[in-house]
Amino acid sequence: MIQQESRLRVADNTGAREILCIRVLGGSGRRYAGIGDIIVGTVKDALPGAGVKRGDVVKAVVVRTTKERRRPDGSYIRFDENAAVLIRDGGDPRGTRIFGPVGRELRDKKFMKIISLAPEVL
C-alpha cells in the first residue's frame, strides 16, 4: 500500500532513483495505491544529467509493493521493495528499459508497454 509521503524506488532508466508520493489518483478520498495504480510524485534523488531532475513533479505507475496482494485464485504476491515506473500523461513509460519484475496486475490495467519492456512478470 502506497500513500502520501511514501518513498518508492524508480524501476526504469529515466535517471530518477527515488520518488516521493504526493497524491494517489482516483478520487478525492482515495488513500492507498497498489500495483497498477497511478500516483503523482516528486523526484527526490536523480542521476546528474538525466532527463528528470530533483524536484520535478511526475506521474508514475506502481509496479512492486511490499504489502502482499491477494489474487483471484487465492494466492498472494509481495515484493521486497516499493517501486514505480515514470509515465507520460498518455500512460506510456518515459524510459526505454524496466528493471526488475513487475506484477501481473499491470496487464489488467492495460499497461501493455510496461509489460513488454519488463524482464519478468510475476
Swiss-Prot record:
Report the GO molecular function annotations. Answer: large ribosomal subunit rRNA binding; structural constituent of ribosome
- Which InterPro entries does the entry link to? Ribosomal_uL14, Ribosomal_uL14_bac-type, Ribosomal_uL14_CS, Ribosomal_uL14_sf
Q: Which domain of life is it from?
A: Bacteria
Which UniProt keyword terms apply here? Ribonucleoprotein, Ribosomal protein, RNA-binding, rRNA-binding
Q: Which Gene3D superfamilies match?
A: Ribosomal protein L14
- One GO CC term on file: cytosolic large ribosomal subunit
A GO biological process of this protein is: translation
| Pfam hit, one | Ribosomal_L14
- HAMAP family hit by this protein: Ribosomal_uL14
Which family, according to the similarity comment?
Answer: Belongs to the universal ribosomal protein uL14 family.
Protein function: Binds to 23S rRNA. Forms part of two intersubunit bridges in the 70S ribosome.
Q: How does it assemble?
A: Part of the 50S ribosomal subunit. Forms a cluster with proteins L3 and L19. In the 70S ribosome, L14 and L19 interact and together make contacts with the 16S rRNA in bridges B5 and B8.
The protein in question is named Large ribosomal subunit protein uL14
Q: Which gene encodes it?
A: rplN
